[in-house]
Amino acid sequence: MTIDRNALGFGVGERAIFAADPWNSRGRLYPEGGSLTRSDFQRDRDRIVHTTAFRRLKHKTQVFIGPDSDHYRTRLTHTIEVAQIARALARAFRIDEDLAEGVALVHDFGHTPFGHTGEDALHELLEPYGGFDHNAQSLRIVTKLERRYAEFDGLNLTWETLEGLVKHNGPLMNADGEGTRGPVPLPITEYCQMQDLDIASHASLEAQAAAVADDIAYNTHDIDDGLRSGYLTFDMLEDVPFLAGLMRDVRDRYPNLEADRFTHEIMRRQITRMVEDVIAVAQERLARIRPMSADDIRQAGETVITFSEGMAETDRQIKKLLFSKIYRHPDIMRIRAGAAQIVTDLFKAYMADPTLMRSDYWVEHTAGLETPAKARHVGDFLAGMTDTYAVRVHRQLFDHTPDLR
């Protein structure tokens, strides 16, 4: 595929006709007056950045739990990298950069301590009460659990930002009302009774940009961290033809490059090639669909900003490599088992005696609740923990805490 550079925005020219319009938003659940200095989507982004949930991302890990180095990525550094790629894509298509950035910044709010390990453990514990889904938890955080404003709980974000948060990976329901990826999580269906997020349609282009940016950042930077940790080697990367080609390109241009610089040159090329692939695909689909509004994107029946078939296959190959060499490595599996034990122990302890949680949280949120509601609030409390806080509290409550090093 080729890219029409003349059609790209890069901050120049008018907003695309299919961009989300910050001056004509579908509004907020609780009506507010506008700002003289910022658009609605700018205000959303700023509210997201100033939350407790955003600050906590600094101490939540993705893959390398309790690493010995300060250079491994956390949820916060990953989120910033996703936002940068999402904003670059939005600029290329002349769509709203602030909305794309806002969705990218908020997309990981609902993640538990200890990455997907913590989420899997918490989902199993909460399964009798509806389960746990980090995307739905993100919605709970920004619509209920963040308590900063005098007139409402949550952040009172615009419809477009909430839609992007919930649907950035695609529609949640099909035309028959069935979940596209299993049952729609309860927090999402409950919220949609107050403000319909149209979960059977696709999301805006801005949200789609955030979603593919997440994939690009996730794979690229897990390779980087894997090489730093020693779980990956350059020889292992040769198993993926796309990565092998990037390494040949770097070696041909810089024959004697030291390892750290060599790694960086591979990573920057990987991001560039993936972004270029996404842009080429989106240009072709936009030319075919000819959308005249943001709603035309939502009703297009397909994802517009996505990988080509070839790059999607590369994405699968990279994920397979990461799973076999990193995520399923015996050292990582041992640490994951310990992390899951910490989450399980804390959940059971709080369910047996909720007063073990912070007293103000217990009095305000959990006292007197029946078991299903109590379990949901215990889940909220646990999901909001950072890795370090969960380990510290476990040490206070139990005689033995798993070693996560």
Curated annotation (Swiss-Prot):
SMART domains: HDc (SM00471). Signal peptide: none annotated. Keywords: Hydrolase. InterPro entries: dGTPase, dGTPase-like, dNTPase_2, HD/PDEase_dom, HD_domain, PHydrolase_assoc_dom. GO terms for molecular function: dGTPase activity. The keyword Cell division does not apply. SUPFAM superfamilies: HD-domain/PDEase-like. One of its GO terms (biological process) is dGTP catabolic process. Residues 75-219 form the HD domain. Pfam families: HD, HD_assoc. Belongs to the dGTPase family. Type 2 subfamily. This is Deoxyguanosinetriphosphate triphosphohydrolase-like protein.
